[in-house]
Amino acid sequence: MNPLLSVHNLKKIYGEGCDDCMGPSPRPGPDNLCPICGSIIACTDVTFDVYPGEVLGIVGESGSGKSTVLGCINLTTPVNGGEILYSRLQSGIRNILEVDAQTRRTLQNIHFGIVYQNPHLGLNFSISGEGNVAERMLVADSRNFAAIQEKVHNLFERVELSSARFKDYPINYSGGMQQRVQIAKALINAPSLILLDEPTGGLDVSVQAKILDLIRSISRELNVAMIMVSHDIQVIRLLCKRIIVMKHGRIIESGLTDRVIDDPQQAYTQTLVHSTIQ
Amino acid sequence: MQPHLEVINLSKVFHMHVLGGKEIVAFENISFTLPKGRFLGVSGKSGYGKSSLIKCIYRNYNATSGEILFYDDNGGSIDLTQAPDIEIIDIRTRRMGYVSQFFQTIPRVTTMNVVIEPLIDRGWKRDDAIDRATELFTIFDIPKNLWDAFPSTFSGGEKQRINLMRTLIDSPELLLLDEPTASLDRKNRTIILDIVKELKKQHISIIGIFHNPEELEMLSDDILVLDQGEPEREIEVPEYRITNNTFAFQV
């Protein structure tokens, strides 16, 4: 099987940077700061593939670089090095870090969808829930109002948002409903890849379970690939067959999810598994 | 006979960083060949690495050294210790099944959906998958009122039968059994043993751990004995013949 997305040696540095941390293999320090110039190494040497239809998990502690990697793929975080090859553009396999502005918007609006932990990042709070999702269809060149409305309503039913609430503003939604609208917004243009950045963080356990069930059933029904970032290895275990473990901006271990959980190789992964699993 | 699985000098050592770098040897330098369609029983005391061996074959554990060659019909092979994860996922989906004594339930998913999921993963239509599962429910004696319930609430025997159904429904060519009859009552044990006998008749290659020596001898063509992490001897036992087969079970 050919990968949908191939990330090679991705690098993101916050700060001035120096020859060492901007180079191919920066010296590791005790944390995610460059030991020479003190710049923040948000991620470096990050290499992995995503295959069509799979859910790939990324776990790691706060500040390990998980969200940075998603931001780089979504082309919202400028990178300092590496390439991201994507196979579904009409022009063939392309490094999406080098595409023009129009292709970039096509990727962000049609090929990719993103769900943030913080709904303020994913939703426009000054328009209705329905409007949030419809707006995304407009940028993908849909113009027929009735067709847009029907598609949005069908999708809202799929993500189990009550029809009485379609026209409410996001501020009036519960945390779970905000995530459902974000998921609908991510799905509306039938993307190839959905980026999930802690989509259930901060939700109570029963709502979390329902959102996870929804994500699981969508990934199975629509065969859309997903990258799921979470610090909760149990959430990842439920959804992902393969995972990547990150620490200090680097990938320290990757493998089949059950293998990483049952036979963790690295010290940090062992600590993570032994801290979270009873 | 054509080999199906060849294990060469396989060792598993756990390096426990969380225990100050302590090393735990699960087993060392195991070699054996499983011919196609044979049942290899694995015996040995608790803690001698039987489960770890099976988990290395399924790649639930990373082997520390050695090779596990898994052959296809054309005589080609893939080393399961080195194959990329994505290939192992495909092999698990299409060719290899694993049943442990612990049922790994999927929360909030009904029995029917748990059982048909492997077929859906292989591209079956939902209706066809449900028909196939319905046949199996009869053979495995799962009453209809449980089909749309959550298995997490079931008895141990029911869970284990569903566990086995989920693994068998997509007809693996190699089956790994890690004490599937442990902690079951006589009725459930008999159901599961009868099904394993039937699989044997269909020449599915099986590696099985059974705690009960009678079960192990009854089912095994060959027995691998693990002793202090090393295979002590390989012995042949007579092939068991099924005399009272009432199953019409097609995998």
Where on the chain are the PLM-derived regions?
Chain A
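A short, surface-exposed alpha-helical micro-motif characterized by mixed small hydrophobic
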Residues: 236-238
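Helix-to-loop junction immediately C-terminal to a conserved catalytic motif
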Residues: 74
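Conserved ABC ATPase "signature" region
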Residues: 26-28, 146-164
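ABC ATPase "signature
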Residues: 254-255
